[in-house]
Curated annotation (Swiss-Prot):
Listed InterPro entries: MFS, MFS_dom, MFS_trans_sf
Originating gene: ctnC
Name of protein: Citrinin biosynthesis cluster MFS transporter ctnC
Job of this protein: MFS transporter; part of the gene cluster that mediates the biosynthesis the mycotoxin citrinin, a hepato-nephrotoxic compound to humans due to inhibition of respiration complex III.
Lineage, opening ranks: Eukaryota, Fungi, Dikarya, Ascomycota, Pezizomycotina
Annotated PROSITE patterns: MFS
Organism: Monascus purpureus (Red mold)
Example of a GO MF term: transmembrane transporter activity
């Protein structure tokens, strides 16, 4: 039973095919005699994705991560435009924050569609369809003349863009071994955070100012003088700037990516054999057992809801992961308040740069998870002593780092204190968010194994809904409480979450033994 831990390394945003992927890598023949059942010709079959050369696996992973960056980039790039667009459409800034929240809400609904599609049609078809429509929906955002068009387009680009977030982690599980896959997943995880962090930073060069009802070029001077941001584009370029590189890398993906989903590859092999031999009895397991609509609904909707009421591990981890993901999107509102309003930084370019502190923390967290996987997890995997709770030590460290970073950020926000300590506080915040997210999801996958898809669907549903809601109250909270106490409130909430990984590390095995869905170890 210990060998089953090989697969639980994906941090899939939707739980896409984590259950099926678990049985794919071995390449072994079935024991039952069926000479026309098409399977891999042993573990060394050259067509088995696990046998791709290292350069090919690395290239595919990099392309996947690039697609992910532009999807998540689109979720936050609009947040910096809330002030200007609120003036153009004559609504409050809080209303314009819906532009970000609706995209994240699309991330909530999308996996319920893209997960099942990847099981039926493979990785590439639904990925290409969703990603192409995601690109197309940048156009109505860029040319919208009314608020309704803008908001609907923002929702649908999130819905279709999440095809990448839902499908790619499962695809990585198709061709990476257990230890290497953890490293590949860490790269994908970093991409999911790099995108939204870069969004507000890249936006600053597209700002323009409304003067006497006419959009003009604007120079924003620092109060200290000397630094000028010459912004000649406009907020609509937040869509064009997303569309252009997303299209470029989408074309590269279309021309280079191979299908990796094992059941579909075997189905294609069976079809090829039927044509070559004229023996129509050749078939694959997918031909025998195509999931029914009812089975798909059970896996991605009904069972996840049931588990949210019955599984304490899933409930607690989902609450924790939802909190840290919500904090990330809340900061897209909080950072401009902290640096532009409180510190009176006039330049949007300068005010956006502190986001780089979170980015540095995300990359450091990615590195630490990789090191922990190599030095702690891999040896246990090799000697067969690994258990799900072995995922939690890095998460416990991150659970301590996150509140440290939050209190650090909040109580260095006074204009009388140098900006540097507050900007540096983003590093432990980024590390905490990345490591809690990665290891928390990995732990859920390890715990639930054969029903991991359902657990991840439940987590995704709640996590995305919470992260969509957080930006909506961020402005009011920070204006009412101030940066110090508003961020401290988040710090206190994160402190309240620290016992979750600690308790599961020591008592997780006993709790799992009482579960209806976790396999008995």
């Amino acid at each position: 039973m210990k060998e089953e831990i090989d697969a639980p390394v994906s941090t899939d945003a939707s739980g896409t095919d984590l259950e099926n992927a678990r049985d794919q890598p071995s390449g072994e023949k079935p024991t039952a005699v069926d000479i026309y059942l098409v399977e891999w010709d042993g573990p060394n079959d050259p067509e088995l994705p696990m046998n791709f050369p290292l350069w090919k696996k690395s290239l595919i992973t990099c392309i996947f991560s690039t697609l992910t960056i532009w999807v998540t980039f689109s979720s936050s790039v609009f947040s910096a435009a809330a002030g200007i667009t609120s003036k153009e459409f004559h609504v409050s800034v809080e209303v314009m924050t819906l532009g970000t929240s609706l995209t994240v809400l699309g991330f909530t609904v999308g996996p319920l569609v893209w997960g099942p599609m990847s099981e039926l049609y493979g990785r590439l078809k639904p990925l290409y369809i969703g990603y192409a429509i995601f690109i197309i929906f940048q156009v109505p955002v860029a040319v919208a003349q009314n608020l309704e068009t803008l908001m609907l387009a923002r929702f649908f680009l999130g819905f279709f863009g999440t095809s990448a977030l839902a499908i790619i982690p499962g695809a990585l599980a198709d061709f990476w071994g257990p230890v290497e896959r953890a490293i590949a997943i860490s790269l994908f995880s970093a991409a999911t955070f790099v995108g939204p962090i870069f969004g507000p930073i890249m936006y600053v060069n597209t700002m323009i100012t409304l003067v006497n009802g006419v959009w003009t070029r604007a120079n924003h001077d620092m109060s200290s003088g000397g630094f000028i941001v010459d912004s000649s584009l406009g907020w609509r370029w937040t869509a064009w700037i997303t569309m252009i590189p997303a299209s470029f890398f989408g074309i590269i993906a279309f021309l280079t990516l191979p299908e990796t989903y094992h059941p579909v590859l075997l189905q294609r092999r069976a079809s090829r054999l039927r044509k070559e031999t004229r023996i129509w009895a050749y078939h694959s397991r997918l031909d025998e057992n195509t999931p029914t609509f009812g089975e798909i609904l059970t896996k991605y909707l009904f069972r996840p809801i049931q588990m949210l009421f019955l599984e304490p591990i899933l409930v607690c981890m989902t609450i924790y992961i939802s909190l840290i993901y919500g904090i990330l999107y809340l900061f897209f509102v909080a950072y401009p308040i902290a640096f532009r309003e409180v510190r009176n930084w006039k330049s949007l370019g300068i005010a956006a740069l502190p986001f780089l502190g979170i980015l540095v923390g995300v990359l450091m967290g990615c590195l630490l998870v990789t090191i922990a996987t190599r030095l702690w997890y891999a040896p246990k995997l090799q000697n067969g002593s690994v258990v799900p709770e072995d995922r939690l030590p890095p998460m416990i460290v991150a659970a301590i780092l996150l509140p440290i970073g939050l209190f650090w950020f909040g109580w260095t926000s006074s204009p009388s204190i140098s900006w540097a300590p507050q900007a540096i506080a983003g590093a432990p915040i980024g590390m905490g968010i990345l490591m809690i997210w990665m290891q928390g999801l990995n732990y859920l996958i390890d715990v639930y194994l054969v029903v991991a898809n359902s657990a991840m669907s439940a987590n995704t549903l709640i996590r995305s809904a919470v992260s969509a809601a957080f930006p909506l109250f961020a402005t009011a909270m920070y204006h009412k409480l101030g940066v110090d106490w508003a961020t401290s409130l988040l710090g206190f909430l994160s402190i309240a979450m620290i016992p979750i990984p600690v308790i599961f590390y020591f008592y997780g095995a006993k709790i799992r033994a009482l579960s209806r869905f976790s396999p008995k170890w």
